[in-house]
Amino acid sequence: MGDPNSRKKQALNRLRAQLRKKKESLADQFDFKMYIAFVFKEKRKKSALFEVSEVIPVMTNNYEENILKGVRDSSYSLESSLELLQKDVVQLHAPRYQSMRRDVIGCTQEMDFILWPRNDIEKIVCLLFSRWKESDEPFRPVQAKFEFHHGDYEKQFLHVLSRKDKTGIVVNNPNQSVFLFIDRQHLQTPKNKATIFKLCSICLYLPQEQLTHWAVGTIEDHLRPYMPE
């Protein structure tokens, strides 16, 4: 008898080869759920938790232009970006969400969350869950960490301030697993014109090989630390 892990790996490799012929990715064989928590520095203040209304998987190479644009803008290095493009990486796009607060019912909207200038957010945490398509099994937590700390995205916003882009602004966390698509807006105040950066969508990067790496616990277990009252 062969090793179960070896058999599983061979089966996944065969599936990947079949999918390549069909120009599909392994991610197309899964359903996903994603939640986004904005964790505040003030520990007594509960996180702002949102459920993503639809998670859209896309293969990395379809977004090659955006990654290379980030290199040109010095957002991240050419070496790390080429490494990213050479991997079988799946992008999981989250364009819309709804609040998990009990007093906000059924309100799905385009992402619209002011990230800067403000200093009360400690980090953004994304929680990803998946299951095989057409499965009745519960969603399981994907064993990967998706966090973006305030200090890391603020540095990039300050860099972007000197440029004129209004749209097409993308910032990423140091290990390039979370990408934020940002909209720059100007507000006229009585004294001057202020620049604000709003989050308009989120994209997670996950190597295909990690799609079948699940942690233990339910959705409720993993959301509990971030749930609003």
Curated annotation (Swiss-Prot):
Pfam families named among the record's database cross-references: DUF4566 (PF15130)
Superkingdom field: Eukaryota
Protein name in the entry: Uncharacterized protein C6orf62 homolog
Organism: Pongo abelii
